[in-house]
Amino acid sequence: MAVTEASLLRQCPLLLPQNRSKTVYEGFISAQGRDFHLRIVLPEDLQLKNARLLCSWQLRTILSGYHRIVQQRMQHSPDLMSFMMELKMLLEVALKNRQELYALPPPPQFYSSLIEEIGTLGWDKLVYADTCFSTIKLKAEDASGREHLITLKLKAKYPAESPDYFVDFPVPFCASWTPQSSLISIYSQFLAAIESLKAFWDVMDEIDEKTWVLEPEKPPRSATARRIALGNNVSINIEVDPRHPTMLPECFFLGADHVVKPLGIKLSRNIHLWDPENSVLQNLKDVLEIDFPARAILEKSDFTMDCGICYAYQLDGTIPDQVCDNSQCGQPFHQICLYEWLRGLLTSRQSFNIIFGECPYCSKPITLKMSGRKH
């Protein structure tokens, strides 16, 4: 109880008990730099679900549309500190929404100058604008015909204040801005950044068009990694450097040891053959001495076997990446499924982050190395 009271004092230093039994608290809750008066009356058992919340008229007005949520939080919060933290977060949201609702509209010159800038840029570049013209999306096409979007969130003091902008790039996009800047200046910087990344997107598009990419299924333009099928239950994961896209990428293989090890040996032996003048795909073919499975002949289902434990292919966005090393078995599993399975076996043993056990299918020895690798 003392720990809870200390935590409550830290979270809400202006809310204090008004009696010895601590059934009545009164004071202030702070949010967005403002303090709001409130009083909480608890029953003798201190259960929040039977408590009463008395608010000042300012606080009651701000929370007027959130009455049901406040009631739900009181019903389900285990103690007063938990409820106060939830109430504080709710108050922050309510105040933010209120500020946006009652924010003063931009002056007329905001719209006139913005319309003029879009006209200079070309209305064909505008793909979206909300009713207030506070959010707009502009498109651009690179030399290879790919379309790219930039989303701009304009503030009331535009152009004195820089807009927020969002792009789907594999590297940070930092546009310079002065009070004299305009949509034309930020769009020019957007175009320059697109051209600087053309070689990277050429490399990734060739991989997407000519190989079976297992992950990601629908890669955004910002994605630098690809997991490419090499055959049944064997794949290579590559991480391409957007600034040096034709250099040797980070590579690691996924699959049974008896299939993966020969590929690793070839990569080490032939690494000197890597030629930055060639594409990543061509270099991988030369270095690994393989032909990637052709999209024209094979279907993706030829490489996408379900997990042998959960019987699904996709699990929380991941696909099976662990394979039984027994060449007669080769059953794939999700890492987390295999981990939970092995952890439940009395015969399994663990050494650091490696678990040793038996394959659920063939009962041959199987090893699982747990990692924090993102899929």
UniProtKB/Swiss-Prot annotation:
GO BP: any one term: protein monoubiquitination
Record-given protein name: E3 ubiquitin-protein ligase FANCL
UniProt remark on domains: The UBC-RWD region (URD) region mediates interaction with FANCI and FANCD2.
GO cellular component: chromatin; cytosol; Fanconi anaemia nuclear complex; intracellular membrane-bounded organelle; nuclear body; nuclear envelope; nucleoplasm; nucleus
Disease as annotated in the protein's UniProt record: Fanconi anemia complementation group L: A disorder affecting all bone marrow elements and resulting in anemia, leukopenia and thrombopenia. It is associated with cardiac, renal and limb malformations, dermal pigmentary changes, and a predisposition to the development of malignancies. At the cellular level it is associated with hypersensitivity to DNA-damaging agents, chromosomal instability (increased chromosome breakage) and defective DNA repair.
Modified residues (N-acetylalanine): 2
Top EC class of this enzyme: transferase
Residue sites binding Zn(2+) 1 per the record: 307, 310, 334, 337
CDD domains per record: DRWD-C_FANCL (cd23832), DRWD-N_FANCL (cd23831), ELF_FANCL (cd23786), RING-CH-C4HC3_FANCL (cd16490)
Zinc finger residue extent: RING-type: 307-363
UniProt region (UBC-RWD region (URD)), positions on chain: 104-294
Record organism: Homo sapiens (Human)
Sorted UniProt keywords: Acetylation, Cytoplasm, DNA damage, DNA repair, Fanconi anemia, Metal-binding, Nucleus, Transferase, Ubl conjugation, Ubl conjugation pathway, Zinc, Zinc-finger
Record note on what altering residue 248 to A does: Impairs interaction with FANCI and FANCD2
E.C. code: 2.3.2.27
Documented effect of changing residue 265 to A: Impairs interaction with FANCI and FANCD2
Modification(s) after translation: The RING-type zinc finger domain is monoubiquitinated in the presence of UBE2T and UBE2W.
Subunit structure of this chain's protein: Interacts with GGN. Belongs to the multisubunit FA complex composed of FANCA, FANCB, FANCC, FANCE, FANCF, FANCG, FANCL/PHF9 and FANCM. The complex is not found in FA patients. In complex with FANCF, FANCA and FANCG, but not with FANCC, nor FANCE, interacts with HES1; this interaction may be essential for the stability and nuclear localization of FA core complex proteins. Interacts with FANCI. Directly interacts (via the RING-type zinc finger) with UBE2T and UBE2W.
